[in-house]
């Protein structure tokens, strides 16, 4: 029986192995007929002479704590994925609603150019063409407004989540104090209600920011998943909403470091649960959506500008630009060692990418990184008159003077694109119809070239405007559908783990009076293993 004594916590590891490996084994049909129960034996028994009942209770406590931890991990993922689904659906609806811009409206524009200029030999931007151009601009600006509204909505949701998290942090801290100073000796059966209350509050906090509980000796800690402690027996850290005076859409999360006496941003420490999902959606998915619309707008407007300014009107004058297009935005890091004059402009929008950039000087070498996928771009760099010119993805970034080591700049190509997009022509302005300025050899070749732009692969030189738009819309739908398939199984996992708590009788003497110590440990361990098998079987049934 002594060997049983040294393996009383076997069931804890058995549970862990079963839960961690079950899904993979079931998904892979190769293993369907050979699912095995793995049991790892670990010597965790303390041979000191404290009460045997306490030792046995620890078997149940370790099992129950493990179960709570697993439920919280799954619940955290469910909240993360459910929050993303809700935001993806909003974004998908918006892109679906506005798809007519890159189908119906743009086709109407090019059809009016074909009919009024090419076929009917018109020579000016008539009312029909002007209206079509203005309608496209109006719809693009409305698209931008709705994206901004969605961004503000996400910002308010983030604020609310931080507020809820702080309420829970305060309640958990206060409840933990009640537990620490509870008169257990006088009221031995009353403390469990306080512990249950604390557990429920931690469950709620976990769904918002993702946490783990650490119990060491007599101490109790609640930490973020990266290990930063936010609640212990003596202190708590409340979260703070970080906003910007210069950008009303910016929001992040941080806390006040008492040791360093300053605010610290911790957005990267909360990568999941509902708050992490909102922060990620705002930082990545919303930004990618805005950049994609900005890229398509630039490609559309500048493709017309480029062709129109190559041709000639009926009087032999070179064509003028049709649209006003804004240049990218430069944001200098607040940590830069020097502040030199900078400027930026588009030099070839055909190379425009749907991403923001970080431009960084390290070891006297300029590095350009696309933030969409963190790929590094090798820029073209040249010096002239003590100025540095850095060209990448159709953008030319100019720095006047010698920049300092470590200086960093963020480049946002489309932050002002939709807001500042303007039509530069008015009704009856001359259309650049001809490829020749010879009045005796006038033709309609330039107008025909503009008319065919809607068929050209002008996005990354491999997609039409609509193809690129549709691919982005499908990527949103795919991510949403993928999560919608995963969430139900995870919810079922939570249900499976519910009500699987194990405990011995409250009357320790009555429960064990006829058993020796080894037998008590053995029976406790058998109960844990039996429950492990029950959980295992329910997971199999769930996936069958």
From Swiss-Prot:
Designated name of the protein: Flagellar hook-associated protein 1
Source organism per UniProt: Buchnera aphidicola subsp. Schizaphis graminum (strain Sg)
Main location as per UniProt: secreted
GO BP field: bacterial-type flagellum assembly
Signal peptide (from-to): none
UniProt similarity note: Belongs to the flagella basal body rod proteins family.
Record InterPro entries: FlgK (IPR002371), FlgK_D2-like (IPR049119), FlgK_helical (IPR053927)
Listed transmembrane segments: none
The UniProt record lists the keyword Metal-binding: no
Subcellular location: Secreted; Bacterial flagellum
Entry keywords, A to Z: Bacterial flagellum, Secreted
Gene Ontology terms, MF aspect: structural molecule activity
CC annotations in GO: bacterial-type flagellum hook; extracellular region
Superkingdom assignment: Bacteria
Entry keyword annotation includes Secreted: yes
